[in-house]
C-alpha cells in the first residue's frame, strides 16, 4: 500500500475527493497516512482527523527562517514514511531540497488549465471566479509532477508595454 502525504492550506476539498475515492474503492493501492497544513485553521486538518489520519500544522511562521521550515517539513515527511506527496491546494512553494528527496513523487493539483490563471491570488475558488469574470468558455484543472526543471524562459524581444499585441517585425 502506497503511503501518501497530502499538503494543504485550506478547506481540503481535493483531500476529501481523494479520501472518498479510497473509501469507495476507486483507489485501491494507496492510503493517506499524513496531512500537513501550513494553516492551523485549515478545515482539511479536521477532514484528516475525521478519517483517523495524522494531521499536523507546520507553518513557516513558526520558524526563524524558510530553511528551518523546509527542513522540518522534510523531516516530518520522511519520519512518516510517505512515499508520494500530493499538493492539494498547498500555497507554499516546495523547495528543491524536498523535490530532490522525492523525485517524480510529488504531484500538484492546480485548479486551472496551466498556464492560465496561475500565480499570486489564483487558488481554490478564486481561480474559477476569475475565469468566469473573464468570460472563459473552457476551464479545468491541471495535475502534474513537480520537479526543479525550468523548461524555458526568455525576456520579450521588444518593449510591448504600450500595446496588447506586438507588431510584426
Identify what each model region corresponds to.
Residues 119-148:
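Short, glycine-/small-residue-rich phosphate/pyrophosphate-handling segment
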Residues 63-65, 69-74, 91-117, 121, ...:
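Rossmann-like adenosine-cofactor binding region
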Residues 1-43:
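N-terminal Rossmann-like dinucleotide-binding module
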Residues 30, 34-58, 63-67:
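Short, surface-exposed acidic-centric catalytic microdomains
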Residues 152-169:
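Single conserved hydrophobic/aromatic residue that forms the stacking wall/gate
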Residues 43-46, 96-97, 144-154:
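Mobile beta-alpha loop/short-helix "lid" or hinge segments that flank ligand
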Amino acid at each position: 500500500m502506497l503511503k501518501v502525504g497530502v499538503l494543504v492550506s485550506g478547506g481540503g476539498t481535493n483531500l476529501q475527493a481523494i479520501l472518498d475515492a479510497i473509501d469507495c474503492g476507486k483507489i485501491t493501492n494507496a492510503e493517506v497516512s499524513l496531512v500537513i497544513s501550513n494553516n492551523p485553521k485549515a478545515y482539511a486538518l479536521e477532514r484528516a482527523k475525521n478519517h483517523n489520519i495524522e494531521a499536523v500544522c507546520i507553518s513557516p511562521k513558526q520558524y526563524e527562517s524558510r530553511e528551518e521550515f523546509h527542513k522540518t517539513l522534510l523531516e516530518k515527511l520522511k519520519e512518516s514514511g510517505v512515499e508520494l506527496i500530493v499538493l492539494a491546494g498547498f500555497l507554499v512553494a516546495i523547495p528543491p531540497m524536498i523535490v530532490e528527496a522525492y523525485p517524480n513523487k510529488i504531484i500538484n493539483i492546480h485548479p486551472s488549465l496551466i498556464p492560465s490563471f496561475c500565480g499570486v491570488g489564483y487558488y481554490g475558488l478564486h481561480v474559477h471566479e476569475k475565469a468566469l469574470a473573464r468570460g472563459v468558455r473552457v476551464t479545468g484543472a491541471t495535475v502534474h509532477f513537480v520537479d526543479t526543471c525550468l523548461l524555458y524562459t526568455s525576456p520579450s524581444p521588444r518593449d510591448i508595454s504600450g500595446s496588447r499585441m506586438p507588431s510584426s517585425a
